[in-house]
Amino acid sequence: MSDRSAEQAALERANLDARIAFVAASFLLAYAFAALLDRVGAPERFVGAAPPYFTILGLATLGFLLHSMRASVYYTAGRALPAAYAGFANAAVVLALMLPFGARLAGGGWAIGAVGGVFIGLAAAGLYVGPLLRKTGVFSISELLCARFTSAATRVGFIGAVALSSTLLAAAGSLIAVNALVELTGANRGFAAFLIAAASLIIAGPGGLSGVMWAAAAAAGVATLGFGWPIAALSLHDALPSGLIFGGEASTEAAKLLENWGVTPTPMGLPVEFATTIAVALGIATLAPVLAASVATWDGRSARRAGVAALFWTVVIALLAAAAIAASALSLARASAGQPPERLPQAIYQASERGLVSVCGAYVRGPSEAQRACAAKGYAPGAPLAAAEIRPLDGDFLLGALPQAAELGAASSGLIASALIALGLALATAGLQACATAFGHDALYRLRGEIDLTSRRLAVNRVTLVVVSTLAYVTAVTGVFTPGALVAAALAVSAACLAPSLALAFWPRAGDREALVALCGGAVGLFSALAVAGSPSRVEIYALCALAGITLGGGLGLLSGLTSRSDKPAARAFITRMLRGDAQMLQPDKGA
């Protein structure tokens, strides 16, 4: 029996590898065809737009082909996702979370602050929290907390916190993809928002977590190629500045440029940066879309290996993105510094007309407007401009502008646009699926006493997907929020509302009352601090507000536990089974 099982497993893995090779070859051939069109002189606009649209079509097709009506596939990808691919997919989700703060990768340290918090949180999620979820057999972090604290009030609170943070991430991912499609291909914003919303639904709707994870793995591959190809091309032509990362000469110069342009914010001091690290790490460690890859693996060991793979690939692709941003900043500065405002590269005027680059503090449509804007700042006609007078909007623009600034061709521009769009779709679909799981499984199934029909649960899931996708579409069209604000808010909600209760879950004296007090205290502390802060525009402000919620919620929960009855046999038994017991400690879900 064991030999037959091993042979069957080997056959299934071979079939899986063959399918992955086919998908990878399809993407590579499509991108190679775009490069060929660029070489033979096809219109630049067509060559630059073809790869992004193919990427959207390819990811949507991949998600649709994985459709299933089985609960085990829809909610957990059949518990059959190999660790290497699960980690690769999770890297795409985490990288998309980092894109709104992408300039910090090239312009600041990784050890502390928002970037450091992301890596610490990913390590905690991948090496401990995720494997714990997989060991216990739950579908999400909210289900684990609901099993530990069983009152209806705490269940509603946990499900609401997961749904809110996941919805914010879905909107952020959609906005990242829409912005890339609009800014780098010139697409109409309404059309781009509709296309991204439809693609997100097609990926997450038919196949659930299976479609989301495999699409995210493909997105990670596209991102590796998209960010890595320009760096490789510059290296082959000996045009890549040395020391682009880790404090080299070019890295230091790029960091100064980014700071002078205002692309990277001014540091707020070591205490604030340290607080940001803690809050962001706790937010990542308890974020449902980040933990979803662990749920889809074979067992706890596979989940831990997936965490290691996710950390490795996140670092690798983040290094490529940091090098690309730094190279783009240096190329842009060298192309424009010393030039009069009426003789800047045409690409700068085009970007300024779309609001992506300011010239002398103004958005201009051509040389004459640039000359007038600089004259208002005291520049004489024909006087050369300082590099600080040409200010890009953000790090995403610098990523997309590298091929033009370094004259790598339209195909490279399309490849980077594809990478940004693919990462945005990975985050959007992961957020959609996590929110739908919270409502369709954690709420509808568990709260109804585990008696609901699978078909009804999946129907509720898909209705939730449509509602959240519609909200993301409206957010993308109106442009009311920025991706950075949405991601920071999601991390703050997750850290303030879930982290204290997760810590209490390991304390035998904590019961339903303590969890409810911690949950409510975290929410009150977070939203009160946000109200005092007004309209926060930096992730550090959201992190400080989250830390206020964590402190209040954790403190109240601890105080309540110390004043409660110390002997809680049920809590002690649950913790013992959770940490030292066999896997699948919860009653298995029917269909799973």
Describe each PLM feature range.
Residues 13, 70-87, 487-592:
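C-terminal membrane-solvent junction of multi-pass transporters and transport-like membrane proteins
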Residues 29-38, 62-68, 167-170, 174, ...:
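Hydrophobic alpha-helical segments and their helix-loop junctions in multi-pass secondary transporters
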Residues 1-21, 65-67, 336-364, 369-375, ...:
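Terminal cytosolic tails of multi-pass membrane transporters
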Residues 15, 148-156, 163-167, 316, ...:
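Loop-to-transmembrane helix boundary motifs in multi-pass membrane proteins
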Residues 13-25, 43-72, 78, 139-167, ...:
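Membrane-interface loop-to-helix entry segments
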Residues 71-138, 280-283, 302-334, 344-376, ...:
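Membrane-interface helix-loop-helix modules in multi-pass membrane proteins
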Residues 37-50, 104-114, 174-192, 210-219, ...:
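Transmembrane helix-loop boundary segments of multi-pass membrane transporters
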Residues 10-30, 110-205, 275-283, 289-292, ...:
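Helix-loop-helix module between adjacent transmembrane segments
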